[in-house]
Design a protein with these regions (language model features):
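ATP-binding/phosphotransfer module of carbohydrate and carboxylate kinases, centering on a glycine-rich
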Residues: 1-67, 77-82, 97, 101-107, ...
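A generic structural motif
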Residues: 29-30, 89, 158
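A charged helix-plus-loop insertion that forms the helical arch/lid used to bind
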Residues: 82-91
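Active-site glycine-centered loops adjacent to acidic/histidine catalytic or metal-binding residues
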Residues: 112, 138, 299
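Conserved NAD(P)H cofactor-binding loop of Rossmann-fold oxidoreductase domains
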Residues: 74
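Glycine-rich phosphate-binding loop of actin/hexokinase-like ATP-binding domains
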Residues: 127-185
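Short loop/edge segments at beta-strand edges and connector loops
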Residues: 109-113, 117
Length: 305
């Protein structure tokens, strides 16, 4: 058995995975909002250790039965280090050695979008496609690309920073230090922030936001927010489609929870003739089959470059 860890911008999820790629036990926890604190990395590792220990104890499994721990995290990583994870304010942190202090077993560290894409290719929405683009849209935006059935992989570091493609010159400043990044306009965090700002309520839950989106009383205000969001999202996707011409785009992350409201509008927008250089190249747009579990599952899948 293996343990998959998915570290997101606001929470960490850990799953116990059997030989068939199925999650048989899962624990998750929200992360401390004080991301800039000096001991944040230590707290993150402690949270991971606690959740792993809880799963092992509940399932009555000895750590010796675990052959691998996989870690999926947004940002740029090496085999051992989180080189840069801007949304988590982590830089040059050897997370592998820290976890190995508690569990001395092999650990694989990968970019989260890449992990999700691998899982969707193996078990989910990308299984029958050779040329595909996977996007994870949540706190930020990450992505991975399959061309000719092979995962496109940078030579030096893990990571394919789609979210930091500039879509608006001199736009909003991003956590990365640049201005106008894709994820500052089209992440689910931005979408939710716009709704909370419009209704002057920063404490709206995901459930309350979904209820607002279908409330006819606020239809005009909601349509304005959705149209603006779809416009920004489609600009970034159109750029990627023009470059890679994928057969399909699969979207995971928090976007999946709002697919009934957003997906059809996105497809309609991309089908407009002025969005793409080749209007015959519009790919199929779908959502991730494994939903938010893709990162956990993909973190432990062995694959060949």
């Amino acid at each position: 058995m293996k343990i998959g860890i998915d570290i997101g911008g606001s929470h960490v999820a850990i799953g116990l995975i059997n030989g068939n790629g199925k999650i048989i036990a899962k624990e998750d926890q929200d992360l401390n909002n004080d991301l800039r604190s000096k001991d944040y990395c230590k707290k993150l590792v402690n949270t991971i250790i606690e959740l792993i220990t809880k799963i092992l104890e509940e399932k009555k499994i000895d750590i010796k039965e675990i052959s691998l721990i996989g870690i999926a995290i947004p940002g740029t990583v090496s085999e051992t280090h989180i080189i840069k994870a801007k949304n988590l304010h982590i830089k040059d942190f050897n997370i592998v050695s820290e976890i190995n202090k508690y569990f001395n077993i092999p650990i694989v560290l990968r970019n989260d979008a890449k992990c999700s894409a691998i899982a969707e290719k193996e078990y989910g929405s990308l299984k029958k496609y050779d040329d595909a683009l996977f996007l994870t849209i949540g706190t930020g935006i990450g992505g991975a690309v399959y061309l000719g059935g092979k995962l496109l992989k940078p030579k030096k570091y893990e990571g394919f920073e789609i979210g930091h493609m500039v879509i608006k010159k001199d736009g909003i400043k991003c956590n990365c230090g640049r201005k106008g990044c894709f994820e500052k306009y089209a992440s689910m965090k931005t979408f939710k922030d716009r709704i909370q700002s419009k209704f002057n309520n920063k404490n709206l839950t995901g459930k309350e936001i979904k209820e607002l989106l279908t409330d006819k009383y606020y239809q005009k205000e909601i349509e304005e927010i959705i149209d603006e969001y779809i416009e920004d999202l489609s600009i970034g996707l159109a750029n990627l489609i023009n470059i890679f011409e994928p057969e399909v785009i699969s979207i995971g992350g928090g976007f999946v929870h709002f697919k009934d409201i957003l997906l059809e509008k996105l497809v309609n927008k991309l089908n407009k003739e002025d969005m793409l250089f080749n209007n015959q190249a519009v790919p199929k747009i779908i959502t991730a089959k494994l939903k938010n579990d893709a990162g956990i599952v993909g973190s432990v899948i062995e694959y060949k470059d």
